């Protein structure tokens, strides 16, 4: 066993261009999974590390495990969330496809820590390589664990990975999210207390169990410790998934992906539930959840989307809004009618076909829709839309008044 390179932890090991890491290679590289006599020790280590959930919400992992462990006794269920329905993210599928045993390690540790007798691996069915790799890894590990383990392919859809949607799907076959109590941690799969954790969070828990919280905190900048998986897309010569120290600036991440500030007009951070930022505001900003929040931006699931200077931000936002409208769970008016209306209005502005009142309507809907839906889907969409109106405000006005795009010079945005 050897300690991973400081800058490469989750993705340390064989190249990410071949087959999944085999169990024997995984054990040779990292050693056997520790079996602590007191599983609360692991929870304390997770708390001391400061590890945050990597599925988007950013809740402290150790605190989440402790809350469940203190009120269950062998009756809980662990759900490994690998649905990854966010189009701009690829980190989870990469981790599952190439480091499946690290994910299984984390799931086993979580089950032992919270007193679970069942582990469900919930993997997006469209991620075929991840489904295959996780299926093989689970089969290889069944004999060593006391928990029942099963793989369930999640339906294709943006909301399918939301906690309540995942639990509803596992219980009834309907991936429908809700904000209605009880929480899944109280009444989840089979009506039992359920720990639902993102695959990256679990993989990191497996490393912390081996190397300790001090090791985890030995890298990172400012007050942020550890590393994170980031998906970079857009104006990048080398787009894809990379592992970086928390606190690394957006500009440094972009440089590693092969681009420079003059090639980038704006940055979308955190994905389709995230926020747009002007390149001048984002470039020196550290990838730090607290710092980003203080600037009104989102870390989310680690997405850095670089909008090229030749692309229209209005049109790109319209495409995202149209997608979010089609991904509605169809259970409330703000989502079904509100997102559809705002998507259509944004598209008319982008296409140079606005009738004169679209911008006012969009601004009004952005303020009215949040908090009124049956789940958080419309809230996330409106957060992105609100940031687009701020970052691309002048371009929205230009489109609406002239019917043309100042970026492409075309009528609307054709490119």
Q: Predicted segment positions?
A:
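Histidine-anchored nucleotide/phosphate-binding helix
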Residues: 99-113
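Conserved phosphate/anionic-ligand binding catalytic regions in large, soluble enzymes, centered on
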Residues: 47-68, 156-168, 325-337, 373-385
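Hydrophobic alpha-helical positions that pack around
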Residues: 128-246, 257-261
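Cofactor-/ligand-binding subdomain signature composed of acidic, glycine-rich
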Residues: 1-43
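Gly-rich Lys/Arg/Thr-decorated short loops/hinges at beta-loop-alpha junctions or inter-strand turns
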Residues: 22-29, 80-92, 186-188, 231-236
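Ferredoxin-type iron-sulfur electron-transfer modules in oxidoreductases and energy-metabolism complexes
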Residues: 29-45, 73-76, 82, 91-95, ...
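Short loop-to-beta-strand transition segments
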Residues: 64, 119, 259-272
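Short acidic, glycine/serine/threonine-rich loops at helix termini
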Residues: 57, 63-65, 89-92, 131-136, ...
């Amino acid at each position: 066993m050897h300690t991973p390179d400081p800058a490469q932890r989750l993705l340390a090991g064989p190249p990410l261009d071949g087959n999944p890491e085999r169990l024997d290679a995984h054990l040779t590289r990292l050693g056997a999974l520790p079996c602590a006599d007191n599983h609360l020790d692991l929870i304390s280590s997770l708390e001391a590390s400061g590890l945050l959930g990597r599925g988007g919400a950013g809740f402290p992992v150790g605190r989440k495990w402790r809350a469940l462990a203190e009120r269950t006794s062998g009756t809980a269920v662990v759900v490994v969330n690998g649905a990854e329905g966010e189009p701009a993210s690829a980190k989870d599928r990469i981790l599952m496809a190439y480091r499946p045993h690290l994910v299984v390690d984390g799931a086993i540790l979580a089950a032992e820590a919270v007193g679970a007798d069942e582990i469900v691996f919930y993997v997006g069915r469209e991620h075929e390589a991840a489904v295959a790799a996780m299926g093989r890894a689970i089969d290889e590990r069944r004999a060593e664990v006391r928990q029942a383990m099963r793989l369930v392919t999640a339906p294709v859809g943006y909301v399918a990975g939301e906690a309540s949607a995942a639990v509803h799907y596992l219980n009834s076959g309907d991936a429908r999210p809700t904000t209605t109590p009880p929480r899944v941690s109280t009444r989840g799969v089979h009506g039992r207390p359920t720990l639902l954790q993102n695959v990256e969070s679990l993989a990191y828990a497996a490393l912390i169990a081996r190397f300790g919280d001090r090791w985890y905190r030995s890298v990172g900048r400012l007050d942020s410790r550890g590393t994170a998986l980031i998906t970079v897309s857009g104006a990048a010569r080398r787009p894809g998934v990379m592992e970086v120290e928390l606190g690394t600036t957006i500009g440094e991440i972009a440089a590693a992906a092969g681009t420079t500030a003059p090639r980038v007009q704006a940055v979308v951070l955190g994905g389709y539930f995230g926020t747009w930022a002007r390149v001048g505001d984002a470039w020196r900003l550290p990838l730090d959840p607290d710092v980003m929040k203080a600037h009104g931006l989102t870390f989310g699931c680690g997405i850095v989307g670089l909008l090229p200077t030749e692309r229209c931000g209005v049109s790109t936002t319209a495409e995202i809004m149209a997608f979010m409208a089609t991904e509605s769970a169809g259970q409330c008016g703000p989502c079904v009618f509100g997102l559809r209306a705002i998507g259509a209005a944004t598209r008319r502005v982008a296409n140079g076909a606005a009738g004169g009142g679209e911008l006012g309507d969009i601004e009004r809907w952005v303020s009215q829709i949040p908090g009124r839906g049956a789940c958080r889907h419309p809230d996330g969409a409106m957060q992105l839309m609100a940031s687009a109106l701020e970052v691309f405000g002048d371009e929205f006005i230009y489109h609406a008044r002239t019917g043309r795009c100042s970026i492409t010079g075309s009528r609307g945005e054709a490119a």
